[in-house]
């Protein structure tokens, strides 16, 4: 599996997006990813919305290919945000420092 960083741009109002993210459906979505029921898995997300950046949501994904991320998100989520995955390597700066 490869790592992909995605800076999603919101297509809907940030308040609407926040409501969706707090819904019970997101808990089920997270469980499905954790149990390997989806082709890709969101490992971490960073939410800048509470801090004034109301047009982006950032995620680190694990997937075999970038298309698996769109498949995992599904059409409903893709109406709410963009998905342009960028394959990345992780640098663990603590390991570099210990080096």
Each model region followed by its residue ranges:
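"Short basic amphipathic alpha-helical interaction patches in structured regions
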Residues: 72-76
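Conserved short beta-strand edge segments in small beta-sheet-based binding/regulatory domains
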Residues: 79-92
